[in-house]
Design a protein with these regions (language model features):
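N-proximal accessory regions
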Residues: 3-4, 22, 59-62, 97-98
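Glycine-rich beta-strand-turn "strand-cap" elements at beta-sheet edges
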Residues: 1-6, 10-12, 39-49, 74-98
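Active-site-proximal flexible loops/turns
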Residues: 19, 49, 62, 66
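An amphipathic, aromatic/His-enriched active-site/gating alpha helix that lines ligand/cofactor pockets
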Residues: 27-40, 56-90
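Residue-level detection of beta-strand scaffold positions
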Residues: 8, 25, 54-56
Length: 98
C-alpha cells in the first residue's frame, strides 16, 4: 500500500519552555513506535522556539487513529504550559514519496 496521507503539526514553544517541549517530542517517539498505522514519524526543531511533527499514513483510518491517539493527548494536555499559541495541525496529501 502506498503512503499517501500525512500530518504536519507546527508548534511554537512558550519562552523558557523550549527544552520541555523538545523533551516531550523526544518521548513521543516511543508512542509513535507503538502505532502500526503511523509509517513515518519525525519530530523536528526549525528555530529557537519553533518545533514540529511530520507523520505519514497509508490510509485515513490510520491518520484518524493517530490524531485521536496518545501523542495528541500528551501534547494537547500540556499545550497551555508549553505552547505560545495553539498547535497548527494540518492534514496533507502526499504528492510524491521516495
Amino acid at each position: 500500500m502506498a503512503i499517501k496521507l500525512g500530518i504536519v503539526a507546527l508548534l511554537e514553544a512558550r519562552p523558557g519552555k523550549e527544552a520541555a517541549l523538545a523533551d516531550l517530542l523526544r518521548s513521543a517517539q516511543a508512542l509513535a513506535a507503538q502505532e502500526p498505522a503511523t509509517v513515518v514519524w519525525y519530530a523536528f526543531q526549525s528555530g529557537p522556539r519553533s518545533f514540529g511533527i511530520f507523520d505519514a499514513f497509508n490510509d485515513e483510518a490510520g491518520r484518524t487513529a493517530h490524531l485521536e491517539g496518545r501523542i495528541a493527548a500528551a501534547l494537547l494536555g500540556r499545550a497551555d504550559e508549553l505552547l505560545a499559541s495553539p498547535p497548527d495541525i494540518r492534514k496533507v496529501d502526499l504528492l510524491a514519496v521516495k
